[in-house]
Amino acid sequence: MNWLEAFILGIIQGLTEFLPISSTGHLYLGRHLFQLDEAGLFLDTMLHIGTLLAVFIYYKKEFIYLIKNPFSKLMLLLIVGTIPAVVIGLLFKDFFEDISKTGITIGWEFLVTGFFLYMADKQKNGRKKMDDITYKDAFIIGSFQAAAIFPAISRSGMTIVAALWRKLDRETAAYFSFLLSTPAIVGAIILQFVDVFQGKAESISSTSLIVGTLSAAFFGYIAVSWMIQYLKRHSLKVFAYYVWGLGILILTLQFTDVF
């Protein structure tokens, strides 16, 4: 893989990690487009590190607060919200890895993501702010995040949808969703590093790794800041239409043996 391909995959990872359209699903499509095999695992890991950097930079005040106040309500909310994904991830890791490699369900998963995004806008706008979020809210939002273990189910999409259903206001829904992404991304990085050290990754040039990581970080930061502002006044339906179109296209190509 050359640095330009890594740069493009970094753009895909950075934008789609925080837009509600599934980063894993788009990375699968990107690897297919560039004819990369699963040996791109090490690059995937570095791309996740890039998006993690984006979150750390955007939420630097929050993370400084969490370090100084490790037993704060915010920390407990993040822990409670992360539990469902940890349980599902540990119990079914191998099963979902096999699904991710084949891509056989990706088209359907994009359609499911679109359904939830479309239905979310039918809810009346909530008024809950960060201080109003309960542990029950965090657990339910985290349970929706656990569904994103399927490769083309959007993590940010599902958590934003769940947050809106729990009556968080639109800005807070996106804000908490991205903050909750941090432990999920860290967990994904840890699991991928385990596979890397077990020899499941190919050798990739340091230039490509650096370019891909910085690209993911830069575009991830843009996506976080843009999405929080966008959701204040705009609908999620445009993302629903996009993933529906993509899902239908993928299913059509799969059924005609083109993909």
From Swiss-Prot:
Any Pfam family matching the protein: BacA
Gene: uppP4
Topology in the lipid bilayer: Multi-pass membrane protein
Family: Belongs to the UppP family.
InterPro entries in the cross-refs: UppP
EC code(s) of this entry: 3.6.1.27
Biological process per Gene Ontology, one example term: response to antibiotic
Spans traversing the lipid bilayer: 1-21, 39-59, 71-91, 99-119, 133-153, 174-194, 208-228, 239-259
Role, per record: Catalyzes the dephosphorylation of undecaprenyl diphosphate (UPP). Confers resistance to bacitracin.
Primary location recorded for the protein, binned into one broad class: membrane
Protein name from the UniProt record: Undecaprenyl-diphosphatase 4
